[in-house]
Design a protein with these regions (language model features):
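Short, contiguous pre-domain boundary segments
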Residues: 1-10
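Cofactor-binding active-site loop characterized by glycine-rich and histidine/acidic residues
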Residues: 9, 13-21, 25-39, 50-123
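Short, surface-exposed loop/turn segments at secondary-structure junctions
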Residues: 40-45
Length: 123
């Protein structure tokens, strides 16, 4: 159990973690579409609303309820939330956060094969 998971014993603590997850997942998508150089100008992907709709549920699961043998299938457009949670849990190196949809980077749909962080099911 990580330090963050141990702190998530109250609703206030869980709400603070939820804010961090929302901010990180939004920043991951924003960087992919607005910050990373993109000569063609096309949106490369990421769905902030689809991610935001899952932040509360996924934060509660990962920081309060999941047991070691539990497995979760994450809806495809919520992968930035999964990556943010894995980062906060120490299971994803910070260097990957700005790599959504980049070659060799984080996938926009969770992938057990291509993502560098733990994914239970590819979707």
């Amino acid at each position: 159990m990580t330090e963050l998971q141990q702190k998530a014993t109250s609703l206030d603590a869980l709400a603070e973690i939820e804010r961090q997850v929302l901010w990180l997942s939004t920043a991951i998508v924003h960087h992919a579409n607005r910050v990373r150089p993109n000569p063609g100008g096309l949106k490369v992907g990421g769905h902030q609303a689809s991610s935001a709709s899952m932040v509360s549920i996924m934060t509660s699961l990962w920081f309060r309820h999941l047991r070691a043998d539990d497995r979760v299938s994450v809806k495809p457009h919520a992968s930035p939330v999964l990556h943010a949670i894995n980062y906060l849990l120490g299971e994803l190196d910070e260097s990957y956060l700005p790599t959504l949809r980049a070659f060799g980077g984080l996938q926009s749909y969770p992938s057990r094969v291509k993502d560098p962080d733990p994914v239970d099911y590819s979707t």
